[in-house]
Amino acid sequence: MKKTLRFAAVASGLVASLITVAPSASAQALRAQGASLADEVVAVVNNDVITGRELDQRVGLIARRLQQQKAPVPPTDQLRAQVLNQMVLERIQVQRAKDDGIVVDNATVQATLGRLAQANGMQLDQYKARIEAQGVPWDLFVRDARTELMLSKLREKEVDSKITVSDAEVASYIASQRGPNAGSQQDLRLEHIFVKAPANAPQADIDVAQKKAEGLLQQALASGANFERLAKNQSEADDAKKGGDLGFKSPASLPSDVVDAVSKLRPGEVNPTLIRVPDGFEIVRLVERRASQNPAASPKIVQTHVRHILLRVGEGKSESQARQQLIDIRRQIESGGDFEKFARTYSQDGSASQGGDLGWISPGEPVPEFERAMNTLQDGQVSNPVRTEYGYHLIQVLGRRDAEGSVQQQMDIARQAIGQRKAEQAYSDWLRELRDSSYVQIKLPVAQ
């Protein structure tokens, strides 16, 4: 788990394209405004340009996403400026990826699209029809998928592959979870107001965001201020609609700057200064403290009790036949059929004699496609057919539990947590340096 607060950000490309909602009035207004500017160059990025048409297409997708989330849509000029900055960063990274010789072949793109279709319980042609019904051109969707895969490979090459975590860091992390002072640890319930200002944003944008955050801080510190209402109306985080309530958090799960700030506060007090985090500025209020609910525990893993039905492809059974048979079985199970009986009758896995029961499995044990699908299911829910190297599966989750895990599993969890934290900071630094070394000319007026 990342040791940073999770904040809202304007989505791009593939993520935004997945939203199923009719265009909002704001999106329609954006299209109308952009029509006359369609071919105007709104940014120069090294030897490339971004046009008004490209910008408006992306803005329209994001406006729909915000509406779907019932989040406020920023004023048109502000949203266009934010999205353009993201597109600039994306374009710079694509250029770097090409310079590095990074390519994503068609087979990889098609495999990714197939997984997306499968996750939505559809064949690829059905998924394509849904995307186009949302007003998203399929070629744009495919292009965004290719771009995201390319940028993922670039980040792996330039940043993630260079992150190291020492055994000493792992030992220190585990000790902090169950060390000699663990019994006196307290969980913290916090509320926050977040103003977005990524470290890699232009300095002018950061200055505007800081000015806004300072104004909100003064309002939050004022006598009689309603922090919850202020967060609902002004915070740019996903939890704004909940008044910025983060719930109870252990100190180990929070950025060190936040922990240091609230350590000096009494319940009900607002930290008197802004806290700079990688994505922006934080205003934090301590709601209450309580004794840690599990202060001496080792890092936990979540085990899943799962069963499945496997149909192998080949030996007279085609891909479509295996998938359709599982769709039919799932339909019968959803109508009251017994999963265990179907598994005993049809499954081609060794677990068939146990009704498909795989017992309690830990993270990393099943193949990735199986684990990803399993992790999306609620208790009792049956998946759509899932393709793995073994064939097609129907998966049913029977329950979940926290477990201490083996010493090696605890070390793996600690190493992953430390690595993710380091990688996020390293990526932010690398992206800022990449932008600083690029020629960027913004021709779109900056929203104030």
Swiss-Prot record:
UniProt KW Hydrolase keyword: no
Signal peptide: 1-27
Localization per record: Periplasm
SUPFAM superfamilies noted in UniProt: FKBP-like, Triger factor/SurA peptide-binding domain-like
GO cellular component assignments: outer membrane-bounded periplasmic space
Keywords: Chaperone, Isomerase, Periplasm, Repeat, Rotamase, Signal
Domain PpiC: 185-288, 301-399
Gene3D superfamilies: 3.10.50.40, Porin chaperone SurA, peptide-binding domain (1.10.4030.10)
GO biological process, one term: Gram-negative-bacterium-type cell outer membrane assembly
Repeat found in the keyword field: yes
Catalyzed reactions: [protein]-peptidylproline (omega=180) = [protein]-peptidylproline (omega=0)
Record-linked HAMAP family: Chaperone_SurA (MF_01183)
Protein name (record): Chaperone SurA
Organism: Burkholderia mallei (strain ATCC 23344)
